[in-house]
A protein has these predicted regions:
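Short coil/turn linker and secondary-structure boundary residues
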Residues: 1, 43, 78-81, 104, ...
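Hydrophobic alpha-helical core bundles mediating ligand binding, dimerization, or RNAP-core interactions
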Residues: 17, 21, 28, 90, ...
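Acidic catalytic patch
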Residues: 101-116
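Helix-adjacent hinge/juxtasegments
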Residues: 61-62, 66-104
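Active-site rim elements
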Residues: 7-14, 80-87, 130
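Short, contiguous alpha-helical
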Residues: 10, 14-25, 33-75, 114-164
Length: 164
């Protein structure tokens, strides 16, 4: 990968992540029962929402810093007490991290970073970050109607929200 390709990938992926983050916050804000879980093996809606928003920040920090360091669940910020607070926290902290990612030098974008035994240039891990968020947002969106909430439009209108 050339420096120009890495820069283009960074621009495209941070744009995608920023766009997806808006949909993520809509899904989080739609939660009406943080304790809801569809199965005993599932996380609660609150646990899943908190994981989703804090993982976005962890991924971004790890990519920008050039190292994924997993020390287990380091705890949830205490201010993540309700859906609105979770969405607000995500907007603030992910916005800061996207700026940090966009300021990476070519050398930082291209440095090899290991993620659970896989090695790739730092900038390529933005795809994994985006996929992780989309995956967990999909899980959370599937919780909404069974908990009695409305499903927001994500990629197009839903049965509960029109785009026109």
């Amino acid at each position: 990968m050339t420096a120009e390709q890495a820069s283009a990938l960074l621009t495209v992926m941070t744009g995608f992540i920023e766009q997806e983050a808006g949909a993520t916050r809509k899904v989080v804000a739609a939660i009406t029962d943080l304790d809801y879980k569809p199965d005993p093996k599932s996380r609660t809606a609150g646990e899943l929402a908190k994981h989703l928003v804090t993982a976005d920040v962890w991924f971004a920090d790890s990519i920008a810093d050039g190292a994924f360091v997993w020390t287990g669940d380091s705890g949830t910020p205490p201010e993540l007490t309700d859906p609105a607070a979770i969405a607000t926290w995500h907007e603030k902290h992910l916005g800061d991290r996207l700026a940090k990612l966009r300021s990476m030098t070519s050398e930082q974008q291209l440095r090899e970073v290991e993620f659970f035994g896989m090695k790739a240039p730092a900038v390529t891990w933005l795809g994994m970050m985006n996929n992780h968020a989309v995956h967990h947002r999909g899980q959370l969106a599937a919780y909404l109607r069974p908990m009695g909430s409305k499903v927001p439009a994500i990629y197009g209108m839903s049965a509960d929200e029109s785009l026109v």
